[in-house]
Amino acid sequence: MSEIIQNFIPVKEIRNGYIETFDNRLIKILEIEPINFALCSEDEQIAIIMSFASWLKIAPVNIRFKSVTRRADICEHIKSLRDDIKRERNATVENLGEGYISLIEEVGMKEALTRRFFLIFESSTIIRLTSDISRAYSEMWAVEQAAKNYFLQCGNKIIEPQDEDEFTAEILYMLFNRKMSENKPFLEHVKSRVLDIMGEKNLKYGTDKIPDIPAVEFFAPREMDFSHPDYVTVDGTYYSFLYIRGNGYPACVRAGWTSVLVNAGDGVDIDVILKRENRNKAVDSVSQKIRLNRTKFKNTQDTSGDYEELS
């Protein structure tokens, strides 16, 4: 693995479902099962918004919501249908089944999309000493449990995998290897990497002991190219990044406004990045603007207490 890839993916270890980085941060990725917000009643939508707003008040300092849109994998569904057709004795039903499969294949190639939604957050504790590790893990566990409870109130379940380390590595593999992951399942890729690394060390699989392999080897792409100013290339896929500033989107929006972004289409990821600011600084900044505006329009003097009354 090249040095540029190692620097771009500073993952030191994946342990207990948490990502430890070389700059001493602890990161967690949770996958959220979505609901159809548009089909909820007005009262249900209000309840969901209030629960989500309550969670944001206690959310970690740095959080990221990420949606990934890809072509739907219809192979398993088609395989299941073909197995059913093989057991079917009625020729008419068999013909209808074949027609249904043809329709799925045609639609699947053009329109079938699948979306995955992730919540990503990190510990506010920087791991510098051994004693920091347990504190950081305790903090992250508490944040994770709170997120599960609040999102459940919103109607969203957090996926709980049997093997959290494998689940986390599989997500990273999918994110960094968009092209390869469509054709090569994660576990198959892991076995392939083990064979490659053992071959490089002149070790024989099945006879010699498998050496210690850094976790990043199992999800890092084979190639990354940052030489072009307008795009990057990762795993044979071209990426462009568009950034909407915090004040570049209307501050007042209707419920469900993110669906416009999420439904942008195949190959479009949406990242919403939130960072908690220092409340005292925010109060001072907002109250100063309030005083300036009121002084300008009303020619009066105000204090920072006005902001407290409004908040």
Walk through the language-model features, giving the residues of each.
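Extended, folded cores of ATP/NTP-driven motor/assembly subunits in large transport
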Residues: M1-S311
